[in-house]
């Protein structure tokens, strides 16, 4: 923990970059090892829990939980459109039907891993990276946090997840839009908890998507709908944030 604190005090941005690198390497390694062991997400979950516990402990020891969004939202449900866009986003994963894509054990491991992923990615990209960069330039921080979150998903091409090029590129597009949306949610609420829950649920529902979602047209349709929903919600929240700042 002392080494983490030393790096954090020296440069919050490089601290964020170090976490991004560690996250990408360990989670990708976990996926590869899980495939070798023959149990989906078995090793990935262990790595995800380890990273989550280390990060939580670091934030708690240094009294940084609220500074990085682990606190109650300060926005009303009405100002967030009662999170209806998030519900619509979650429904996209199920629009082609519902089926069990893994065995019972693997489904449980997959769901738990996806909530670890949601937690880690929100804290790392929104809490750490965006939080560090916004001190210098808010607009640059929004752009970088959104783009790095989207582009970071291209690692699925080589981590053993089985994603093909087209599917992965489509994922990068809507992940960038989702990254923008989550940043705007964080800015409006001062909390990452709603982002973590929505992110984790969206990822977890992938374990139940219907067969049509894997077809070329299904992938394109899903990507377009997700990009439209997340972009529209992000733009609405951006205007809401600007309006509130102008009245303060």
What residue spans do the PLM features occupy?
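C-terminal membrane module of polytopic membrane proteins
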Residues: 200-248
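Functionally important transmembrane alpha-helices
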Residues: 168-220
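Alpha-helical transmembrane segments in multi-pass membrane proteins
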Residues: 10-59, 84, 108-109, 220-231
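Membrane-interface helix/loop boundary segments of multi-pass membrane proteins
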Residues: 120-146, 187-191
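Aromatic-anchored segments of alpha-helical transmembrane domains
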Residues: 20-29, 87-96, 115, 147-155, ...
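Juxtamembrane helix-loop-helix connectors linking adjacent transmembrane helices
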Residues: 4, 32-43, 59-123, 130, ...
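Hydrophobic alpha-helical transmembrane segments
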Residues: 13-18, 79-84, 108-111, 139-144, ...
């Amino acid at each position: 923990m002392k080494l983490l604190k030393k790096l954090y005090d020296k440069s919050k941005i490089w601290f964020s970059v170090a976490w991004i690198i560690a996250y990408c390497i360990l989670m990708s390694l976990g996926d590869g090892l899980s495939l070798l062991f023959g149990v989906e997400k078995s090793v990935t979950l262990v790595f995800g829990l380890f990273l989550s516990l280390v990060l939580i402990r670091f934030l708690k020891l240094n009294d940084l939980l609220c500074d990085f969004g682990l606190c109650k939202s300060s926005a009303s449900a009405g100002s967030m459109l009662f999170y209806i866009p998030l519900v619509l986003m979650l429904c996209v994963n199920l629009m082609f039907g519902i089926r069990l894509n893994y065995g019972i054990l693997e489904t449980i491991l997959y769901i738990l891993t996806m909530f670890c992923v949601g937690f880690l990615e929100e804290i790392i990209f929104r809490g750490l990276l965006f939080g560090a960069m916004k001190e210098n330039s808010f607009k640059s921080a929004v752009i970088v946090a959104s783009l790095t979150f989207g582009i970071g998903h291209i690692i699925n091409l080589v981590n053993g997840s089985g994603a093909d090029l087209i599917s992965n590129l489509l994922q990068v597009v809507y992940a960038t839009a989702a990254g923008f949306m989550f940043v705007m949610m964080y800015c409006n609420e001062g909390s990452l908890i709603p982002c973590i829950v929505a992110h984790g649920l969206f990822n977890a529902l992938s374990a139940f998507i219907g067969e049509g979602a894997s077809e070329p047209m299904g992938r394109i349709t899903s990507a377009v709908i997700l990009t439209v929903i997340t972009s529209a919600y992000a733009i609405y929240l951006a205007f809401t944030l600007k309006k509130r700042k102008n009245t303060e």
